[in-house]
């Protein structure tokens, strides 16, 4: 008995002249069986303990169900009609009877019944009867308990159909004794004809789509008290469910807020780390700290330089204070604001690469942000110095490869040049002002001096040699030629300063 029970519960069985209450279990021997196995226990305890049933009965050739037959003092009964017998089950309530009826009908398949009246003139006794249709079996039954008075198989019928005020069918020679034409008076002739058509064609009109099982009633409920208890239980479950949902909603709100706070804290930590990283990578000058920085760096640089270098530094004009980068004009935030530090560093590198391929006219724009000239000199790297030796002390230079020629803007060609070394300081200041009206912000003095030395060596009409950046700064890619920049300066073997390389 491995199959699950179709239905089980407390019922009343007829034993002689008395009704006895028993625990009844109905199950199928196999999923495809067309019979039912009825197991009878004394009470539910025997069933739960796994004891052997008191009696068992196999119901074969089931042809119909008849509920609500008043029998032997019970109004709520259910008759399971077979070809050879009928089993009467009694219940304490109408709900329990209907629940058993529904579950058994669902387990058997297509089970229908119609109240008809048999017309005279046939082999059947005329009078009221009940037509039962169970799958492909058709029977007529009467009396209480019901007894079968005629039986047919749908496949053995020659013809059938609805007629005015009734239903007619004809049994063929395969029906044996029940062959012939039979007329049943009923108002449900059309419905009977429809069911016959569906069952003959293998269609189940009362079954839903495959895999979907309807909600079957609970057979254990009985009486008004049981119904009230069931309603109270459902209300209690609804209240418990509502309470759980409210607790979940209240407990979920702090969690979500905590997640938001954790996310915001993590983002703030990330922004602080970005600020610290950018402060190590970039050094944007400030208006207030520029003068202090130059005054603090002055003594250290003078002590590290030689006597000649000190003299050259004394003759060099002082640097103009660096102006702060006005990032607000281009829609950016200040570098001290959180969240823009890493972006400022990336914008610096991006603007530096954007100037590649442009000519030297960009040096005129003193307000350009991110250009190479606007970057401050490195604090740790010393500023390159020029050679202080007299011009006649130059030694023999080793010839190198051909000199690269570059196009020079007219602004540099038309700049006034003063070859006399006595007026070098004044010419330095004049050439710096002629390049853009004023010295570019943050332009190192060595760049200006190197550019003047390069202009003094070139002749009129010849191409100007562009100065090379200092070792602490990057080369500005402003020439059309790719590759490393040419060497325009040589290191002096006497003082170690830079001097312009003469043409070969």
Curated annotation (Swiss-Prot):
It comes from the Eukaryota. Disruption phenotype: Mice are immobile at birth and die shortly thereafter. They do not form neither acetylcholine receptor clusters nor neuromuscular synapses. Keywords: Cell membrane, Lipid-binding, Membrane, Synapse. GO terms for cellular component: mitochondrion; neuromuscular junction; nucleoplasm; postsynaptic membrane. Residues 4-109 form the PH domain. It is found in: Cell membrane; Synapse. It is a peripheral membrane protein. One of its GO terms (biological process) is positive regulation of skeletal muscle acetylcholine-gated channel clustering. SMART domains: IRS, PH. Residues 105-210 form the IRS-type PTB domain. Residues 210-232, 248-348, 371-483 are annotated as: Disordered. GO terms for molecular function: phosphatidylinositol binding; protein kinase binding; signaling adaptor activity. Residues 263-280 have a biased composition (Low complexity). Residues 285-297, 331-341, 421-430 have a biased composition (Polar residues). The PH domain mediated binding to phospholipids with phosphoinositol headgroups. Affinity is highest for phosphatidyl 3,4,5-trisphosphate, followed by phosphatidylinositol 3,4-bisphosphate and phosphatidylinositol 4,5-bisphosphate. Homodimer. Forms a heterotetramer composed of 2 DOK7 and 2 MUSK molecules which facilitates MUSK trans-autophosphorylation on tyrosine residue and activation. Interacts (via IRS-type PTB domain) with MUSK (via cytoplasmic part); requires MUSK phosphorylation. Probable muscle-intrinsic activator of MUSK that plays an essential role in neuromuscular synaptogenesis. Acts in aneural activation of MUSK and subsequent acetylcholine receptor (AchR) clustering in myotubes. Induces autophosphorylation of MUSK. This is Protein Dok-7. It comes from Mus musculus (Mouse).
């Amino acid at each position: 008995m491995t199959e699950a029970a179709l239905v089980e519960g407390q019922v009343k069985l007829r034993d002689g002249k008395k009704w006895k209450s028993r625990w009844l279990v109905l199950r199928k021997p196999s999923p495809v069986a067309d019979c039912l196995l009825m197991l009878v226990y004394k009470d539910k305890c025997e069933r739960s303990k796994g004891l052997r049933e008191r009696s068992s009965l196999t119901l074969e050739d089931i042809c119909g169900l008849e509920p609500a037959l008043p029998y032997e003092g019970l109004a709520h009964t259910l008759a399971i009609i077979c070809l050879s017998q009928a089993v009467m089950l009694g219940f304490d309530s109408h709900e329990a009877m209907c629940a058993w009826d529904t579950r058994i009908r669902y387990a058997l398949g297509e089970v229908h019944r119609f109240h008809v009246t048999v017309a005279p003139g046939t082999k059947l006794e005329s009078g009221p009867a009940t037509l039962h249709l169970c799958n492909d079996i058709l029977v007529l039954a009467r009396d209480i308990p019901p007894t079968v008075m005629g039986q047919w198989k749908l496949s053995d019928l020659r013809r059938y159909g609805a007629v005015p005020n009734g239903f007619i069918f004809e049994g063929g020679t395969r029906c044996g004794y029940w062959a012939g034409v039979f007329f049943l008076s009923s108002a449900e002739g059309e419905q009977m004809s429809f069911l016959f058509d569906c069952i003959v064609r293998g269609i189940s009109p009362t079954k839903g789509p495959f895999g979907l099982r309807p909600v079957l009633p609970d057979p254990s409920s009985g009486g008004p008290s049981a119904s009230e208890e069931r309603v109270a239980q459902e209300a209690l479950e609804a209240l418990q469910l509502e309470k759980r949902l409210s607790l979940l909603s209240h407990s979920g709100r702090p969690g979500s807020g905590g997640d938001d706070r954790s996310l915001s804290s993590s983002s703030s930590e990330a922004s602080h780390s970005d600020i610290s990283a950018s402060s190590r990578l970039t050094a944007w000058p400030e208006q207030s700290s520029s003068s202090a920085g130059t005054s603090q760096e002055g003594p250290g640089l003078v002590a590290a330089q030689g006597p000649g270098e000190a003299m050259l530094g004394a003759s060099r004009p002082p640097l103009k204070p660096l102006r702060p980068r006005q990032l607000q004009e281009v829609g950016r935030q200040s570098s001290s604001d959180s969240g823009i530090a890493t972006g400022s560093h990336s914008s610096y590198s991006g603007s530096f690469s954007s100037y590649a391929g442009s000519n030297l006219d960009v040096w005129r724009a003193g307000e350009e942000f991110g250009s190479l000239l606007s970057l401050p000199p490195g604090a740790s790297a010393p500023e390159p110095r020029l050679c202080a030796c007299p011009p006649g002390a130059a030694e023999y230079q080793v010839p190198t490869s051909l000199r690269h020629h570059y196009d020079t803007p007219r602004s540099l060609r038309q700049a006034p040049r003063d070859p006399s070394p006595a007026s070098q300081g004044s010419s330095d200041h004049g050439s710096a002002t002629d390049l853009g009206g004023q010295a570019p912000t943050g332009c190192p003095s060595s760049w200006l001096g190197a550019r003047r030395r390069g202009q003094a060596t070139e002749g009129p009409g010849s191409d100007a040699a562009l100065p090379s950046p200092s070792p602490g700064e990057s080369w500005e890619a402003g020439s059309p030629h790719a590759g490393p920049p040419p060497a325009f300066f040589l290191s002096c073997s006497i003082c170690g300063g830079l001097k312009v390389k003469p043409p070969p």
